[in-house]
Amino acid sequence: GDVYKRQAIGKSENMVCVASDALAMAHLTRNVIYLKDGDFASLNRDSITIWDRSGQRVNREAITVSSAPSLIDKSGYRHFMEKEIHEQPDAIAHTLSAMRESSSIEEKLADVSNLVILAAGTSHYAGQIGRYWFEHLAGLPVSVEVASEYRYRHPAHEKGGAALAISQSGESLDTLMAMRHASKLGLKSVGIVNVPESTIAREADFVLPTRAGPEIGVASTKAFTAQLTVLFSLATRLGLKRGHLTAAQVDIYETILRGLPGAVGQAISQFESVRTVSQYLKRAESCLFLGRGLLYPLSLEAALKLKELSYIHAEGFAAGEMKHGPIALIEDGLPVICLLDDHELSTKTISNLKEAEARGADIILISTQSAAEKVDFAKHEIVIEDCNPVISPVVLAIPAQILAYLTAVEKGTDVDQPRNLAKSVTVE
């Protein structure tokens, strides 16, 4: 059978240690041996002996991992999550550099008939946003699957498809097993991971790295925006290769990408302005998040961030779905948080907000400047500078993260290690 919890053996001059993640041993050693499926090992202070599943003694190569101790320090911030929010401009810039180094990936995927995105949690919401980009920019049919469900299904895929497995750790069991399932069904596999030594990175046919650096906080921030950066860049390059975009259009999108670290940095500069909203929100027992188009999946991610950090019940909905059921939840004082940009459909979203406000909801806007100017009935606003709507999920993710973080701080919860959660989920 498969190893359901990958083991890493760390070795230094006078000690041996074992963990499921090399990051846990970064303060002790950077020399790591990864066991393969079926391996078992005998350890003592001076030696490591490994046998494979057949009982044969084997040598497994030690590698030097990239997570230096200096990278897992809070660097003066109160929490790792706060630090990681502030690291996002650099994480995006480094990821863009990595994508430029992956210059042939569109050649390898140019002839795929469809994409299947496999992921869990925050990575799944990144995949949902990516679906819009692949459809719009590359003309590719895309399905986004919950990894824990996909691995037990018998999906009917067109021949010539590819599976994108998205995982910060590269060790998420459900995503790994879903990727293996997709490979057995004949799909090419592409891993989008933040840990280059991970199992998904080793087993995927192709790898697109996010270079966000070690992410310690359980609630993902910089890995999420780095994943979005990879997905957007890949979509534009596939769009050009498949003839769906012109070179001139791709140049425009490349310019947008080059400006992304700066746009994200500007959004982070609004950090303290979010505090007033968090002081209001900490008293809520429940709230709704709304978004439309690219911002619908971001509303799901924003709701996840708030619930996992502050333990406030939060649900995300497509704004147009409010009238099909969720509007029954509206009562006086219920916070309804809307992610809004100046898109061609923004007037429809504003109409949905008016319906909620008329029934007693407290409207909170997380929006770009020009979109905010169209709304005069919000109780609170978190406003960032305008950006191209095609990339707004990356930029608007920042104030959503800050709101969840500061609300949790106001409530006094364990921000970096929320209850009942783990950073890398390696069990079923």
PLM region spans:
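Glycine-rich phosphate-binding loops that contact phosphosugars or nucleotide phosphates
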Residues: A110-G259, L339-I384, L403, K411
